[in-house]
Amino acid sequence: MNIYIGVEISVRELDSSLLLATLAASKGHQVIVSDLESITKGISSGLLAPGIFHAKSLTPADHKIARHQAMIDKGFMITSIDEEGGLDIAGYEDFSKGRYSEKTISQSSAVFAWGPEDVETLKRVYSRHSKKIYKTGSPRADLWKSLFFKYWGKPKSAPTKPFLLVSSNMGLANNTNPFFKVLKSKKISGYYERDPELFKRDMGRVGEDFLRTYA
């Protein structure tokens, strides 16, 4: 089987995508890991033979739905596991409705989930498609296992005594993009149309993030 794994943010996704690709290749599959634009061009031009396109998310934006449909029309199958996971959000209900839809799941041959909370919520919210939703875990989480300690190595500056790590990544306050661009991107992608309360939550979150970051 030909498998194409799309990578959007290499620092976040490349290692886990290569792990997935290595395991698939060991089973005899032909795997390409590349940026989305290159894969899309290869498929539209007919250069890449039909197979599985493994997407980083099933966000129901119009352009993504159209892209996946074009792939399906050329004989490709769509699979996905959401790279973002929703681990920093209490509950999974809002995430399941903002990052998925009946249409994007119906286009997919398989939807993989990080753990019990997301798979149970997805199966309940999208009960018509419950048989194609699987609890597999994420290859990103697999890389946290002790098996890969040597792969990551230990920084020379790492403390020798027990320590508490406090993440300084406040996703909205110190994002690489200004907050207004984040809002614009979400609006274009239809997040606020699908979940009218999300705009209020984002405004609340960015206020809290700025307080934590610059207090």
Regions found by a protein language model. Name each.
Residues 2-154, 166-174:
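Active-site and donor-binding regions of nucleotide-sugar-utilizing enzymes
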Residues 147-215:
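Conserved catalytic-core segment of nucleotide-activated headgroup transferases in glycan assembly
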